[in-house]
Amino acid sequence: MEVPRASPNQEPLCSISPSSLVINEIITVVTAIRKTTRWRNSGVASILGVSTLKDEFLADGLESRWKTNGEKSSSIRYPLVMEFSQLKEDLTNRASLNGYDSLKLLSPFLRTIKSPRMTGYITSLCLSAILKFFSFRIISEESPNLALSMRNLSFAITQCRFESFDASQDEAVLLRVSRLMEELLRGPGKAVLSDDSICEIVETGLSMCCQSRLSQVLRYSAELSMTSILEKIFERLKYIDVKTDSEDFWDASEEHSIKGEEFHYKKITEGDEISNEIDPFGIGSIREVFRVLVSFIDFGKQKFSDNIKAMALRFINTALEVSGSHISDFPSLRVLITDTLCKSLLQLIRSDHTALLTNSLLVMTTLLQAMPGSLKLQQELFISYLISCLHIPSTTPRERNVETSLHKVVSSLDLSEEISPDRATPTSFTERKRFAFDTRNRPPEVRELIVECLGSLSRIPYFLIDLYVNYDCDPQMSDLAIDLLKVLTRNCLVDSARYSTANVPPLCLDALLNFIYYFHEHLQPCYNDPNNTFKDDVAKTLIESKKRKAIIIEGAELFNESPSDGIAFLTQHSIIKQSDNPTCIVEFFHSTNRLSKRVLGEFLTKGSNSHILNAFISAFDFKGKRIDEALRLLLQSFRLPGESQLIERVLETFSHYYMSANPDSMSSKDAAFVLSYSIIMLNTDQHNPNIKSQRRMTLDDFCRNVRGVNDGQDFDRNFLSEIYKAIKENEIIVAEEHDTELSFLYIWSKLQQSVKITEPFKRSSSNVHDKIVFLEVWKSIMAALIYVFSTATEDTVFYRVVNGIQQATEVAAAYELNEPVDYAIERFCQFTALDPSSVPGTQLNTAIKVEDRIITVSELSVRFGRDFRAQLALLVLFWISSKFGNIIDASWPLLVQLTICLARNNLIDNSFLPGFKLFGYQWFPFPEPPLNSGKPALSKEGGLLSALSSYLSSYANDEPPCPTDEEIQHTLCTIDCISSAKIDNFLTKLVDLKQPGLNKLLDSLLSLSNPSTSLLTDENTVDDNKVSSVEALSNIQSAIVADLLTSLFLGTRESLNKLERRTQILSYLLFQIEQSGDEKVINQLSLYIFEMFMDDDLKLSENSEDWGLFSKLCNLLNDKNIVVRNQSLSLFHQLVNKYPFLLESWIGLQLVQSAVNTNTADIDDLYRLLSKIPTNLLDLPMFQVYLGCVDTLIQTIVKQIAQILSKQKKGASKGLPFDKSILDNHSAELNDAFNLFLKAAVEYKVDSNESSEHFQDTRWKIIYDHVCKLCLSRSRSLRAASLSCLQRIVVEQLDQPHEVSYTMALFHLVLLPTMENMITVLTEKPEHKIFGLAQAQMFNIICKTVLIDMNVLSAQKEMLHTLWLKLMDVAIKLSSIHGSESMAEVMESIKNVFMILHGAGALAGPTIEVDPEIPDHLIKTWNTTWNNLFIYYPELSNDLNINNEAEMKKENLKNPSQTTTV
């Protein structure tokens, strides 16, 4: 069966019957009472209880006769015991105590507690029983008569009396008393206790805490209970109506006095009647409790020890923590805090007692967090003193790892000691300490406590911002925010531990990081001001206020040196409205405390400034003040000069205005003058340390000095006695010139007077002021953080500092502030040691294969891999740069130079650069260090001789020494760090920069126009014997800058002045090409130029400025004979598609020529370029260049074919398969190249009027010369392609209209000379027999040419005869060389020609005897043919069928109409 669980809200909580539980407690207490000697004979009634007879058994006098021995009843002799018995009897028959009277239930227990005849043990039992009643909710909020029972209970426990026998038992009683008081406030009584009860409870609790005779454990326990009690008391402030309190509550009466540690409340004695109507406690008791707590820490009273004061401070802190800002809503409590409490705290913080100082600082910190709006002046005084205590007199030392410029920045933040004994403004540390009349150097432990206090304040979200807004921008206040930052900055440096403890630097660092954290936190949208439109107005107001303050400070300093100059300066800046108006001048004197008291006194007492003196004194309110009080008020504002004449001048004016304010105080102003002078003399007499006490002026002496000056009468002696006493006890001083308690009290009174006229403390609730404050403080904070970074040795410090710097840069970026981001980048660049001034040379760089990759080991990579600080700096550097690229301004050159340094040492590759993704190139002109194939040198193992041997052998092989394993590991660490830094992401995302950051980067890149000096700023970095190193640096810089410039220009989507930027970038690139001698770099730069000209926004024309730049590029490439790479060729090809006129220009053709002459790999690109050239539009010189390019292209292809054949031949000898496809591809390329000759022939139109004499000057002749020259090549493939091309060109030419002379010129100037050259040149070679086919092909071409152009040649038969004889001569020569049997193709060709000529009648045959009309030359031609040709080619006669031919001829002669023509 499941047992039902009790609900937590059920009453009571005990599992047994509540009546039984109470009865058990009664039995326990009564049993303990019976066992005592005094109560041992209490009788059976204490056991059986009290019962009465029923009515029917009672009779008059019967009951009295039943009493034993005539003794008194036990109820009379032992009423306390009988009361317990009566309660037990009453509860015996009750199953539940709901609705039972709580006062009746507690009454016997309370009487026992108050009884002085009870032992401590019995009292302790009663207290425990009551505690149990509350714990088990036997007494709860619903109990009847609860308020009265709680009032009686509080009275009982505060009046607890018992017989003391055992000290430990006594303390147990007190422990339970304190526990029960705590339960009263925490339990059901918290809502019904009266003001008097609260005061009684707190008074009792404080008494227990302060009794030194009690054990330390009991006092600690009582303190814990008091802490809990005070929490509940001051929690009530949240629910009390503020209107129940009044600021005028405190008066001079004893009842409402703000002084004294005694409680002021109506105390109830044993015989007093307690009213049934009780009001719950409220502001009255809370105010009284707080007043007593404050009185415990009164600095002027030495009644309490430091430990008691420390305890009171803890109680006060508890009250402030619980009540929070609500406590400032009550005027009387606010007065108590702002005056009495703060004055005591500001005096206690000078203590060296650890507990007292700790708790004083804690209370002040809690106050500033709970109610800063009411403590503006007190907060200034407090923080100023703390700053002065943390001042380090020495300058910042120079650490080994700290860069000079950084050290200068940090050193500039040191606060100098400004000792100016006559200045009223608390600007120097000495003067700040005087506010607490403390000129000692605080111990190290005290400095640590002060830093911890400032650290707590730094965790207030708007603390620094509120300081700046309320103090730094207030002309009358100190620069608390700036000074606080300076002192924290100075103390966060490691050397400050010499003046304090080792914990101070990290504590100060933590405070600075807190400030940065809250700046960063306020960037969240929830902190935005809903009235964001007024943010600019607020910022403008703050800036103007800060400027005004600076002017006032400068004017005051100038006044202290020269009053006239100071007034003129202040008038010029409208601080003093009119310099000739004494009222305006005096208003300034009274409005600032920055003037020197001495200088002001000298200025006012000058005779020429009497009108200003009158205006100055008239501004004081002397009404109702005694003359010494008025004089004290006046002389606090300036130092009275020592000359009697000047003193008299001041006192005469003072007397006049004093009598005007107090006409009834004395008879005349002369009397006031004499009395004032006497008071000054009395003040000097009483407080001059050089006068012995026996010779000091007495009251009688003072009265005698002023006898009869009051219009012939004496002043009242009591009046003079009060003056004498006031002067004797309190010297008239200028407070800032003394270090006494009196000076502090004066300054404090002056502060209280200034509270009413001081602007209220402005507490921030949004980030409206953050930007202005951050702009003012960022440099000091970041300088400190970076300084710590440079000297830190622990990982935690590194990471905290880095996190702080990251947050600071995020804040700067959010407010679009360039300088903080640039500052961080500049410093971290220095930490990486990759800046130009510290980069080592690259002469010893060596490449080595590690696993499956090749790495470059350099001095830079090894050094960087060893330096953890440098690696972390690199990570942070590129985190900042990547995230806030749009904010970077002046640090772009550093980032570019760092990238160049990495590239120079092969620590990044082309994939890092934006051009890699944007342009798709696969190669970049990085340095190529020698590849070291040896094993790593010994690093730690191995002897000196082996290491030396390895070193020398490496130089003998003309290579750097092989790197050690350790160096390789450091290099790998460097590579990993660079990869983690994500430099590639940073560089590739540069194209996404917004304006104006994009223009700033472009300007920075263009400024690096002289690479030989831009990176080598340190003379020591350049070795005169290593000029090549400088050139290498120049080359890599040029290439990287060019990549960035081109990528930014072409990859950005931002608006640019494209015309201007394009010209700048192209000019830069051309300049670098002109200066560079490295072909790889020039190629890469030319690639970028081609990319620039491919821009869609560029409209290139021959009259534009860009055309001149393009022409310059082409000229440079030609002049330097640069091998143009394939990607550049592809871009040029695209450019040609976009601007076809490029190939019609001499510039474009020159570029093509340069590419053809130098490039040996990109045949397709070259062919496409050449094929696009419109040869018909080229003039003759350009045409010659074009054909030369085709010729060179053909030669290149032939060389490649030869190389392939050679490789395949070698492969065949090794049994490797023959790849015919490669050879076929190149053969196709060769045919395509020859087609370019044909293309030129096709596009060229022959002038039909052109004579044969001009043939050699025509383009035909140029084309034939190139093709025929190639026909003489020893390469079979080249000869075959050349002959094929030649034949097609001939056909193409003859297909166009022409004269016979043109044809004959073709034969005699081109074909036949070529044939002769082939016979002559090729026959001379040893392997001439293998060229027979080529000669036969050439002869075949000539014969075909005759046949093709027979229609033209037939008209000039004489020319045909000559041509035939020449052909016959060639055929004979070929037969003599190769034999007729091997020249079948020649014989076939000559036969065809013969038949055509013979058939056309151009050549006579064997029938010439038949026709006597045939000319002699035909007969001669035939005879020559018969006698020569048929001798060498006898088969030819049979093939030609001469006899049949003769018969046919005869028939033709008979029938001329049937003559056949060709």
Swiss-Prot record:
- State the UniProt keywords alphabetically: Cytoplasm, Golgi apparatus, Membrane, Phosphoprotein, Transmembrane, Transmembrane helix
Subcellular location(s) per record: Cytoplasm; Golgi apparatus membrane
Entry GO CC:
cytoplasm; cytosol; Golgi apparatus; Golgi membrane
Which residues are modified to Phosphoserine?
A: S411, S420
Its placement in the membrane is given as: Single-pass membrane protein
Which GO molecular function terms does the record list? guanyl-nucleotide exchange factor activity
Report TM segments: 119-139
Extent of the HEAT repeats: 1102-1139
Its recorded name reads Uncharacterized protein C211.03
Question: What organism is this sequence from?
Answer: Schizosaccharomyces pombe (strain 972 / ATCC 24843) (Fission yeast)
